[in-house]
Amino acid sequence: RNIYCENDANCFALSEAKDGSASHYKIVFGVILGSGCGGGLVVDKKIISGKNNLSGEWGHNPLPFYGINEDISVLQSTLDTNLDIEKFISGKGLEALYFENFKKKISAKEIFSKKNENLKFIENFLNRLARSLSLLINIVDPDAIVFGGGVSNEIENLDLLRDMTGNFAGKKSIKTSFIKPKFGDASGVRGAAILGRDTIY
């Protein structure tokens, strides 16, 4: 019996590109913002893994830096040289940053549930996310970006996020569609099933 393995973010992207919310797009990038920060690239409904199987690992790039005061304070308050995007916009990253700022240990879900209390913190998160997504636009320029994962579920306005991303990508407006997944949290498992079926048959 053969066993096939694939990255969860790739499976998520495949599911949504095959017959999910991004089924009518050619180039689809799936973003998973959960405890970590992952991604998957699908072109013509096929996963693009790359020579090193790293094509979707955008979260391990350094956070684009624009001299934002809040970023400077983070750099000054830690000796950690890890400036990966994942450190700033993933669930675990947000929890660590929140503790550094307020000396309180709360979950990422709690941060967003107390929106009024944490408005500036959430604004900083969206700003960093938009900067990070601008890298995807400038390098891959996908037709659509599908957002999955617990942190993504907390983003209320994807159109606003798209406009912010466009500004950092050097255009006032971008045509890339920012969309929610049709199959929600089940899309990764579903994509794995699709991949297994297509590989065998």
Describe the residue ranges of each PLM region.
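ATP-binding/phosphotransfer module of carbohydrate and carboxylate kinases, centering on a glycine-rich
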Residues: E16-H24, F65-Y201
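Phosphate-binding/catalytic loop of phosphoryl-transfer enzymes
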Residues: R1-D80, G191-Y201
